[in-house]
Amino acid sequence: MDIDEDEDFYAPDEPQAAPPTTAATTTTPATTTTTAAPTTTTTTTSTTTASAPPTTTSSSTKPEDELEEGEEEDEGGGAMDEDDDSDIDIITERKDGSAPPPPVQSRYSEIRNIPQRAAANDNGVKTAPVKKSDGTNSNSNSSSNKFGGGGGIGNEQKTRQGSGAAGGSGAELPPVRTSKIEVDGIPVYKPVGKPITGVVIDEDLPENDKPWRKPGTDLSDYFNYGFDEFTWALYAQKQEALRGEYNAEAIAANNKKMMEEMTNMMMMGGMMPPGMGGPGGPGVGPAGPGAMGPGGPAGAGGMGGPGGGLDGMPPEMQAMMQQMMGAAAAQGMDPSQMGQMGMAGGPGDMGGMGGMFGGPGGGPGGPGTGGMGPGGPGGQGGQGQQFGGGFGGNQGQGGYGGYDQMGGAGGGGRGGRGRGRRW
């Protein structure tokens, strides 16, 4: 660029001129713009000739000359760049054949220096990675031999063998360490010899052992999870009650006790004689329409208590019977009328609660309503259901359409042939 400007500046002093170039520039500006500009540039740089005097050129050609000069500058710079590139020599091999020095390893390996996996060639054969530790191994071997140590290769092989054996058998690995703290255990307060949940602060601890009561102390140094002296006492009491209630041994003991009570109740019920019940009260239910056939014989007495009450029964039996009566009352039934429910089928109506529990039947019943014949004899309570409570045998056939109501084994009194439903 500097050379071209100097040539333009000193152009009038040189004797040589280029009339063809001037004529071409003056006569054909379009041609100069398209095709003649490179030719003019080449001529100017190679022959170092100057253009014509400024008087011969017209004003219309000045912008074109300026463009040509700019083009000359660009092309000249490109030529210089090409010359600079041609001077660079790339040497890929060492002339002396010496090994390269060992690479300097930094403290932290960079990502780009991490060795990649060997890529497969076009033939499908994998190339083995090149080892860079030839010089370092030789230096380490010589230094170790110099100081009387074993060879580096031998030590490396031994370490590899030892690591393989340890990884295979696991005998040389360090033992697995586990915590020895029992998480679910309750620590024992040694001065008192009680578990920490059973220590009573006011009784087991003297005044000197209550530093949290001193002014300015932090309770979190002595109580965790936001407890204080009083909430801790409530928590310990609750924990003790829960452990006593839901302990496996306590539950097993309660179950065993309940089984023994049930067994005693069953044995007492089986040992009672059949005629233990007292006489029942008089029948109070009206006679229903008679069923077919005459009344059957009276059934055997049940195991019920005395007629009219539960005085001779064990407490457990009385409690269960009270539960049964409560359940009947909950269903809308009147417990006082249970002796009349469905048992007034014939004249031999079972009276009172004594008939329910196997006592003998009540007094003679009245004639059947609309019956064609006399009523049968008074029926006694049959063999009782559920804890010996007999409700009479087949006595519900006469009462209000003849539904069989809780019949036992004994035959109750049946009315005469009446207008009831035939069964």
Curated annotation (Swiss-Prot):
It is found in: Nucleus. Residues 360-415 have a biased composition (Gly residues). GO terms for biological process: mRNA processing. Keywords: mRNA processing, Nucleus. GO terms for cellular component: mRNA cleavage and polyadenylation specificity factor complex. The keyword DNA damage does not apply. The keyword Nucleus applies. Residues 19-61, 135-146 have a biased composition (Low complexity). InterPro entries: Fip1_dom (IPR007854), Pre-mRNA_3'-end_processing_reg (IPR051187). Residues 1-11, 65-90 have a biased composition (Acidic residues). Residues 1-178, 278-307, 360-423 are annotated as: Disordered. It holds the Pfam family Fip1. Belongs to the FIP1 family. Pre-mRNA polyadenylation factor that directly interacts with poly(A) polymerase. This is Pre-mRNA polyadenylation factor fip-1. The gene is fip-1.
